[in-house]
Amino acid sequence: RDVVSKAESFITEEVTSVEDALQGARDIIAEWINEDMIVRGIVRQQFERHAMVKTKVAFGKEEDKEAQKFRDYFDWEEPLKNCPSHRLLAMRRGEEEGFLYFHIAPDDEDIQEILHHRVIKGNNAAAEQVAIALKDAYKRLIKFSIEFEFRNISKEKADKEAIEVFVKNLRQ
C-alpha cells in the first residue's frame, strides 16, 4: 500500500489527519535514527575530521566596552583540530561572559548527504518520508548532542594543555 493509504489507517480522535499520522511516523523514525550507533558514529567521525569552531558576537554586544577583549572572535571560523587551546579557552570565556556565540560543527549539508546515502534505501514515497525524518533527526537531535560531546572533549583537552603550559612555565 502507498504511504497515504497506510497513514489514513492511523487516523483517530488524537491523530486527525494524514499529515499528523505521517508526522508521528517521522518523529518515531527520527528517534530510531538518533539512537542508531552507526549513524551517531558517522556524525562523530565527521565532527572529528571536519568540525569548525565558529564564533559570532552576541546580539547587541558589538560596541560593549567589556566585549572588546573578544573582538578578534566577533566573526571567527577555523577547523577545531587546528584551534590552539588558548584560543579555544578565550572563545569559551567570551561565550560564558555573554559576548560571543560559540559553536562546533562540520558542514551540515555534507553530513546530511553522507547520512542520506547510508540510511535511505530506495526512491519512493516511503523513502521520502524517511529522508524528512533523517534531516529532522540530524538537525533536532543528533547534531546538538554530538556538538555537546565535542564541546566537552575540546574543553578538557584545552584545559589539560593549559595546565601543561603552566607547569612547564613554573619549572623554567
Regions found by a protein language model. Give the residues of each.
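Duplex nucleic acid-engaging cores and interfaces of nucleic-acid transaction enzymes
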Residues: 1-172
